[in-house]
Structures are given as structure tokens and as C-alpha cells.
């Protein structure tokens, strides 16, 4: 749709937007004419038939009448003309860029719309509109630059750290200088948030050389501890070793080097690697553990090769009845001892696979040795070996049963391995505490132990109560009846 020249002039005279011009001079006369045209354009929004209802404004700055009525009419009719104005805006795209009226003109209506009063004026337009709903006629200003910072990533180190702490996504690539990166790290440390510190350290690890990173972290112990923990978690042993070497932490360097054996699967290669760890500067306690680890793996390799040969030959009874379910290689010391007690219990002390040899070589405590050997021999139901395990002789040749782990634990392990009642009763009787003995005997149905204990306690009432728990007509019931009818026992109740 083509517009005539008159329509275009009417639009620019009536619109609150101004056409683009290259003339930057502040012409007082042109501003005055513009203001006059803007005021006269208000007449188009009201009924021209009634001249008495139209208030006029003189150009001397003094109000002739109330202009608020005209503005109300303008606000009421603005809705009907909104669609036409939108079409005009779409046709003139450059009109969306509003130019602020220059404040040099005393009578500029834009100054009235902003609520400003020039010196010497009697009444501002904002005062005249005080009884009407507020409506902004000023050109829309551009959004502040700060609202677009999410897109430009124009954040300071402190702002970036706060955003990271809140879980917001932001790039750290804009921090390119060493000073900015270190300030970013210091801000992260001051927040006391481990996740933020780790995120910044990952960025520094990727963008800084090792020498610069280690040098700066040496004087920042909090960040240094976080980096060490992070490297241990991700398994970056090479960088961790370089860091400890730079910090001259020999013991931690040795431990990190020792930890690398976990990545070696071949037993022979792992043994050779552990041999190189023996001479590293560990503490006295750690050095003993490293030596034991090397010796144990060396023994396991020998035992594994020998037992694999015996098992494949099929000439050894223990391997035929109980085939091996797993290899002994890289197993803990206690597991190796159990394996030795299970398959090599009767071997001479001089062999590597002998349980006694393992006990002496690795200084295994008596309690640990007895507990492991008992579990292994009870699983095989080798009750004679169990009995020999607790039988000791004094210097006079008398035998006595002694258990470093306590006979109550012996009873529980035997019951777990389905030991016969006669075996259980023998070891229940060896429990010294009476209450513990009665509880175990009742729990595992060792009736003879319960009956004999109540007899020794001369507790007739408890014996009568226990009589109802045994089977009718059983040997235990007959034994209880014989004790109750005996005149040689002086019952206490």
C-alpha cells in the first residue's frame, strides 16, 4: 500500500518517534516547531465539532486551560489506533530506534512526559495527569549491558566462582592471563567449596604447564590437597609422581609408586615391580609391609605352579575330592593361610606351602592362626586335627586343652560346620563361664551338658523345667528322673 506525501508528514508529525537525520545541530527553532506540531496533533484524537471542549496551550508557556481532558481522550482512543501504528512501524523499520528529545528546548513535550519541569513553567504535564492512570510515553531505552552478560561471559573471577557454586554453566576460557587464573583459584578457595576448587584446578591443569602449576600450588596448601586427592581419584599416577617429586615428598612419592602395582596383571611382572619398591624411602612400618607383600607373592607363585601340576595330574586325594575354585595368586595373607591349612596342613615346616612356615615367616599371631586353621579343618570335618589344634602338653607330660580364641568361639565355628553333637558337647564343657555354657548348650541342644550343669548347681527347679524340653521316653528324660529321685544330692531348692 502506497502512502502519499501528506500521510507520511502526518505520521512523523503525530508519532512519538522521530525520523532519522544526520543533522546534529541543536536548532532551537526546529525544536520549537516540532513541539508545536506535537501539541497540535492532539486535536486529531478529539471531536473537532465542539471547539468549546478543546483546551489550547499558548506558546508563552502559560496554560490556557486544562490539558488533562485531552490526554484522557488520547489515552482512550490510543487503543483503536494501536493496530494502525503497528503497521506503520513495520513499514518503517528504522523508526523503532527512538531518539531522545534534546533538553535544550524549554517547551519540549518529552520533558513533560518524563515529569521534568523547566524553570519558569507554571505546571508540568505530569501534574495535570495526576488524576489519571500512569502511562509511559517516553521512548523505550535499550536493556542494560549487564543483562546480556550471560551470553558474553563477561564475568569477574568472583562472579564466576559464585555462579559455579550455584551450579550455573559458565566458561573459564576467558581467563587467559596467569594473574586472572590465580585470582580465580583464590576466589574458589575463599568460597570453601571443594567442587568449585576442583573445577578450577581442572581448568588450570589443562591450561598451565606442570612447572607453573606446581610452583603456584606449593604456596596454596588447600588447593594443593584438593589436587592431590583429585589425581588419586582419577588414577593419574604419572602427574601425581611428578608433583610429589617437585614437592620433595619422598615418602608419598614412594607410596604412589607402590600403588602402581595394582595396574600390573602379570604375576611375575608384578613381583619384579614390588622388588623395585623394597628399596624406596618408606617409613619403617611401611617398609616391612612392602617386604612381606613381595615375599608373599613370591610364595604364591611357587605354590600356584606346584598345585596346578598336582591338580592336573590327579594323583593327590585332596585335590580330587575338593577341586580348587580359584587361583591363590594375589590373595591376602589370611586367604593364603586358609588355603595352606586346607590343602597342605600336614606338610613339613620346611616347605613354602606349610601353614607353620607361613605362620613363622609372616609372624602371624596365635589367635589368627588358630582361628584360620580351625575354619579350614572343620570345613573338611577333620575332627582329629581340630582336637590336636587345642591339645597342649606341659613339662610333666600331662595334656590339656587350651584355646587362644576362647572355647565359646570354637563351639560356634564347629556348629557352623555341622559338627556332631558329641564334638560340640566336648567343647561346650570346656567353656568356663556357667551362664555362657548353659546358653550354648541350650542353643545347640547339648542336653547332657545342661543336665550335668544343673546337677552341679543343685538346682532342682531348673532341672524340672528342663525336663519338659526333652523328648518323652528319651535317655535324657530318664537321666533327669534318676537325678531327681536320688537321695544323695542335697538340692538347694
Swiss-Prot record:
Residues 142-152 have a biased composition (Basic and acidic residues). Residues 68-99, 123-152 are annotated as: Disordered. Pfam families: Vps16_C (PF04840). One of its GO terms (cellular component) is Golgi apparatus. The keyword Flavoprotein does not apply. It is linked to Arthrogryposis, renal dysfunction and cholestasis syndrome 2: A multisystem disorder, characterized by neurogenic arthrogryposis multiplex congenita, renal tubular dysfunction and neonatal cholestasis with bile duct hypoplasia and low gamma glutamyl transpeptidase activity. Platelet dysfunction is common. This is Spermatogenesis-defective protein 39 homolog. It comes from Homo sapiens (Human). The lineage of its organism: Eukaryota, Metazoa, Chordata, Craniata, Vertebrata.
